[in-house]
Amino acid sequence: MTKNSIAVTMRYDYFYNGKEVRNGIDFNLINWVYNLGYTPHLVPNDIRYFKIIKKNKFAGFILSGGNDINIKTTRVLLENKILKLSIKDKTPVLGICHGMQIMNRFEDGNLTRVSNHVQKYHKLCDNEFEYPNKVNSFHKYGIKRLGKNFEVIAYSNDNQIEAIKHRKHNWLGWMWHPERDKIFNKKLIKIAKNFFKKKKI
């Protein structure tokens, strides 16, 4: 089963003034993974669940968006373990927004606060690949120092880093949310399909 599945991490959703904390994921991200031809396997924010992840061979991982990075949260600890596992098993990892930030930080990069990048659309510039002309933006932090062995493959028109890939590992990072487009972008679907098939993109 898992060879046709992609494991997807989830965000924290807080209710009742923080007294109740839930695992959360956008239904559209689930649909987006199905559009890639895979079954999404949702990963709860529980470090004990990593034992299950290690026992299975997924086609890939998606570190999803949502939540600013707090290095002490179980989510971040779990996502770091997933990145380490992906290096060992050579499993593709796609980082979406928060997920791309986690990848960058894992390789000693850091972030800086940015303005005008929440609920906006930005043009992409200096694209290495056939990305769309415009992408959505829902983040308060951008990359200040690029992590080791990463290269930038797309900038926004205001010179913010929007997409990165790793030179050694099969890691790809997007600062935008492909699942939040009203109609899923066909170019992104094609890029992601090839990526999880471990083809060169």
Per-segment meaning from a language model:
Residues 113-137:
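An acidic, glycine-rich "communication" segment
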Residues 1-98, 106, 112, 121-123, ...:
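N-terminal beta1-alpha1 cap of cysteine-dependent amidohydrolase-like domains
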Residues 99, 139:
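A generic "binding-loop/recognition-motif" signal
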Residues 172-174:
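Residue-level marker for buried hydrophobic side chains located in beta-strands
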Residues 136, 142-145:
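Substrate-binding strand-loop-helix patch
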